[in-house]
């Protein structure tokens, strides 16, 4: 019996790995490189669920990917941060980053209320839009006690919209006259994922990409204080409503902070850093596959439309406002 359970666990884990690896490699191909590995992984998982059903007998391995590998990926995500670089970028860019995070969450909740959408998904999308997409959503989902299908829907939506917006940014840069500093800062402070920032920022050249990444990594850094604030708010609301539900601290975020400190104070060889970043990406993709397997098409039909409209409206407002502020400060 134990050997059978172990076999089912390994099959479930292998399923998420195979789809993740395929998505990782497929995202390097022309056209698909614009779609992104996250979007590919989630779409394949949802399609698998639709045509083959949820592989219940392999759920232990799938659940391991969606929980533990996801947390491990977020811990390694901290290696993308160098605190000295973020502090050294100056107060202007960091101040914009703070404004972007606050605006994204508040605007998302405001639009969601007008559309009578799901508040939990709106919160996840607000944090994801303001900070760093899928990783931020996965980090705060335990704080909000989000269901796995809501987390998967949110990540799928933000991966899709971020890809579309990054392509729109490149078109705008090609058509309109814009300095590399303005374009880079605009991309960095307003696009959803690091991959989207790289896609759009790289189109403006190395100088634009450099300032874009600084702007984006400043937002990633803000994940640390943001989660602390969210935990305090949720605990206050929980005690105020005399709820017995305890708001737990996502301790893997401590690992995220430790990795950020390690990358700041320790010189890690570039080869090792690239290997660790690849491992982080694969683990994150495996988690996305596992989350996607929890989403049925009826869930997308019933729960994704309003959040999709909400994030589009919010992203348009964010991009417009960010451009005005960046143009004013960097022109």
From Swiss-Prot:
Subcellular location: Cell membrane
Residue ranges crossing the lipid bilayer per the database entry: 9-26, 31-48, 69-88, 93-115, 122-144, 154-176, 183-202, 217-234, 247-269, 273-295, 308-330
The keyword Cell inner membrane belongs to this UniProt entry's keyword annotation: no
UniProt keyword list: Cell membrane, Membrane, Transmembrane, Transmembrane helix
Membrane-related topology note: Multi-pass membrane protein
Cellular compartments per GO CC: plasma membrane
Matches recorded under InterPro entries: UPF0324_pro
Superkingdom as given in the UniProt entry: Bacteria
Pfam families in the record: Cons_hypoth698
Protein family: Belongs to the UPF0324 family.
PANTHER family reported in the protein's UniProt record: INNER MEMBRANE PROTEIN YEIH-RELATED, UPF0324 INNER MEMBRANE PROTEIN YEIH
Protein name: UPF0324 membrane protein SA0329
Organism from which the protein derives: Staphylococcus aureus (strain N315)
